[in-house]
Protein backbone atom coordinates (compact mmCIF):
# COMPACT_ATOMS: atom_id res chain seq x y z
CA UNK A 1 0.00 0.00 0.00
CA UNK A 2 2.83 2.39 0.86
CA UNK A 3 4.61 1.86 -2.47
CA UNK A 4 1.45 2.68 -4.44
CA UNK A 5 1.08 5.93 -2.49
CA UNK A 6 4.68 6.88 -3.19
CA UNK A 7 4.24 6.03 -6.89
CA UNK A 8 1.12 8.21 -6.98
CA UNK A 9 2.95 11.12 -5.32
CA UNK A 10 5.87 10.73 -7.73
CA UNK A 11 3.50 10.71 -10.70
CA UNK A 12 1.76 13.87 -9.46
CA UNK A 13 5.13 15.57 -9.00
CA UNK A 14 6.20 14.68 -12.55
CA UNK A 15 2.92 15.93 -14.00
CA UNK A 16 3.21 19.17 -12.00
CA UNK A 17 6.73 19.78 -13.32
CA UNK A 18 5.73 19.12 -16.94
CA UNK A 19 2.73 21.46 -16.73
CA UNK A 20 4.82 24.13 -15.04
CA UNK A 21 7.52 24.02 -17.73
CA UNK A 22 4.94 24.15 -20.53
CA UNK A 23 3.15 27.15 -19.02
CA UNK A 24 6.47 28.98 -18.64
CA UNK A 25 7.16 28.46 -22.35
CA UNK A 26 3.72 29.75 -23.31
CA UNK A 27 4.10 32.90 -21.18
CA UNK A 28 7.58 33.66 -22.56
CA UNK A 29 7.06 36.68 -24.82
CA UNK A 30 10.67 36.89 -25.94
CA UNK A 31 11.11 35.68 -29.47
CA UNK A 32 14.01 35.31 -31.83
CA UNK A 33 11.64 35.83 -34.76
CA UNK A 34 11.28 38.97 -36.79
CA UNK A 35 7.86 38.65 -38.40
CA UNK A 36 7.83 39.75 -42.05
CA UNK A 37 4.34 39.18 -43.43
CA UNK A 38 2.08 36.41 -44.70
CA UNK A 39 3.20 33.16 -46.34
CA UNK A 40 1.93 29.81 -47.51
CA UNK A 41 5.22 27.86 -47.35
CA UNK A 42 8.82 28.42 -46.28
CA UNK A 43 9.97 29.31 -49.79
CA UNK A 44 7.70 32.39 -49.65
CA UNK A 45 9.81 33.71 -46.76
CA UNK A 46 13.28 33.61 -48.37
CA UNK A 47 12.86 36.91 -50.20
CA UNK A 48 11.06 38.59 -47.29
CA UNK A 49 13.88 37.60 -44.93
CA UNK A 50 16.61 38.46 -47.44
CA UNK A 51 17.89 34.88 -47.57
CA UNK A 52 18.76 32.39 -50.28
CA UNK A 53 17.39 28.85 -50.35
CA UNK A 54 17.87 26.39 -48.72
CA UNK A 55 18.40 28.55 -45.61
CA UNK A 56 16.89 27.30 -42.37
CA UNK A 57 16.69 30.82 -40.92
CA UNK A 58 13.26 31.42 -42.45
CA UNK A 59 10.09 29.74 -41.22
CA UNK A 60 6.45 29.93 -42.24
CA UNK A 61 4.59 29.43 -38.99
CA UNK A 62 0.98 29.63 -37.84
CA UNK A 63 0.04 32.88 -36.10
CA UNK A 64 -3.43 32.50 -34.62
CA UNK A 65 -6.24 34.02 -36.67
CA UNK A 66 -3.80 35.86 -38.94
CA UNK A 67 -2.93 32.65 -40.79
CA UNK A 68 0.70 31.84 -41.50
CA UNK A 69 3.47 34.41 -41.10
CA UNK A 70 7.14 34.48 -42.09
CA UNK A 71 9.50 34.23 -39.14
CA UNK A 72 13.05 35.40 -39.90
CA UNK A 73 15.63 34.15 -37.40
Swiss-Prot record:
Disulfide bonds: 33-72, 39-60, 45-70, 49-71
GO biological process: defense response to fungus; killing of cells of another organism
Predominant location: secreted
Key word Signal present: yes
Record-linked Pfam families: AtDEF-like
Organism superkingdom: Eukaryota
Signal sequence coordinates: 1-23
Disulfide bond as UniProt keyword: yes
Cellular compartments per GO CC: extracellular region
UniProt keyword terms in alphabetical order: Antimicrobial, Disulfide bond, Fungicide, Plant defense, Secreted, Signal
Localisation: Secreted
Family: Belongs to the DEFL family.
Protein's name in the database: Putative defensin-like protein 270
